[in-house]
Amino acid sequence: MIRTDVYWQKINDLKTALKDAGYSLDIDNQREELLRLEKELEKEEVYTNLEKSTEYSRKAQAIRNKLEVFDKAEKAISDAEEIITLAE
C-alpha cells in the first residue's frame, strides 16, 4: 500500500504556495481587469482607435497569459489530488 500521507502533505504545501502566489499576483483583480478590458475592446470608440485597441489587446493578452499559467497550476494540483485519492 502506498503511504499517501506524504503526498497529501506535499499537495497541501503546493496549495498554500499557489494561494500565496495568487495573492501576490492579485489573481482575482486580474480576472476582473481582463473582463473590463474585453468589454472595452467591444466598444466602437476603442476598436476603431488603433492605438487604444492595440494597447488594450496587449494588456488583455498579458493578463490571459498569467491566468493561464495560474489556472494550469491549479488544475495540476487538482489532478494530483484525484490521483492520490484513487491510490488510497
Where are these regions (language model features)?
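Charged, heptad-repeat coiled-coil alpha-helices that serve as long linker/dimerization "arms"
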Residues: 1-88
